[in-house]
């Protein structure tokens, strides 16, 4: 009986470890690790989702107290005494996220509001999307991996490159360390693009979606070349529903 019980405990521990590894989602790097590995001649732009919000999805919707604490913790992870630049959408919760990350970094809150962070970047025709019932996580994730839905959505690769070109135009006014806060639709699509579709955000298949404070690190060398790493500010880059 004792032997059977020990075997059962071992199986349970293995199963738990596997579940945690699956939930953490191989492919999302801890934001602190990515930050610590930056070379002195590299710049970084963290494009991430806002912190945990309440049930108000409107522009006036705010972070929960937990969401504020999450953002401050992420700021502490990427704190180095160097002033960062912040940009957010016109939604209050993205500004709050930037502000609390700045608190965690002990930064002055230098920030701008950017329209390209509002979350609709990849949606070509919102009327079509709504008429066809595509305004949901299932459709967005399937489109990002498999394409199609051309009447409502742009081409993922082409539209992502357009966004990155737009980012380049802002770089002269930015810092070496930069934090951009957007929304789940925008960040999910960019994470799928930046990882060459390697991150597991197949919501229409397995109910996995981008977590709060997860996204993409855009690392820029002295010659302007870009490379990408998907990052997580919390324990996981994925929300499993």
What is the meaning of each model-derived region?
Residues 14-19:
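C-terminal segment of classical bacterial N-terminal signal peptides
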Residues 20-115, 143-154, 200-230:
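Active-site-proximal alpha-helix that buttresses catalytic centers in soluble enzyme cores
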Residues 50-51, 184, 234:
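Active-site metal-binding loops of divalent metal-dependent hydrolases
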Residues 225-241:
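Low-complexity, Gly/Ser/Thr/Pro-rich intrinsically disordered linker/tail segments
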Residues 55, 82-85, 99, 109, ...:
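Flexible, surface-exposed loop/gating regions in the mature catalytic domains
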Residues 4-13:
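Sec-dependent N-terminal signal peptides
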Residues 161-225:
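Active-site-adjacent alpha-helix immediately C-terminal to a catalytic or transition-state-stabilizing loop
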């Amino acid at each position: 009986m004792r032997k059977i019980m020990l075997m059962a405990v071992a199986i349970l521990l293995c199963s738990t470890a596997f579940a945690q590894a699956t939930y953490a989602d191989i492919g999302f790097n801890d934001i602190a690790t990515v930050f610590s590995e930056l070379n002195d001649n590299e710049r970084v732009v963290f494009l991430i989702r806002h912190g945990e919000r309440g049930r108000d999805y409107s522009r006036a919707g705010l972070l929960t107290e937990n969401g504020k604490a999450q953002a401050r913790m992420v700021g502490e992870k990427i704190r180095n005494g160097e002033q960062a630049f912040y940009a957010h959408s016109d939604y209050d919760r993205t500004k709050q996220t930037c502000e609390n990350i700045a608190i965690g970094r002990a930064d002055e809150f230098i920030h701008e509001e950017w329209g390209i962070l509002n979350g609709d970047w990849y949606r070509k025709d919102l009327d079509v999307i709504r008429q066809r019932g595509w305004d949901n996580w299932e459709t967005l994730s399937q489109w990002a991996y498999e394409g199609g839905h051309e009447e409502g959505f742009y081409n993922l690769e082409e539209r992502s490159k357009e966004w990155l070109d737009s980012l380049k135009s802002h770089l002269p006014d930015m810092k070496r360390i930069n934090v951009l806060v957007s929304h789940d639709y925008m960040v999910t699509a960019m994470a799928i693009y930046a990882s060459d579709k390697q991150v597991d955000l197949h919501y229409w298949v397995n109910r996995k979606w981008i977590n709060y404070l997860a996204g993409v690190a855009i690392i820029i060398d002295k010659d302007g070349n870009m490379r990408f790493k998907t990052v997580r500010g919390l324990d996981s880059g994925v929300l499993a529903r």
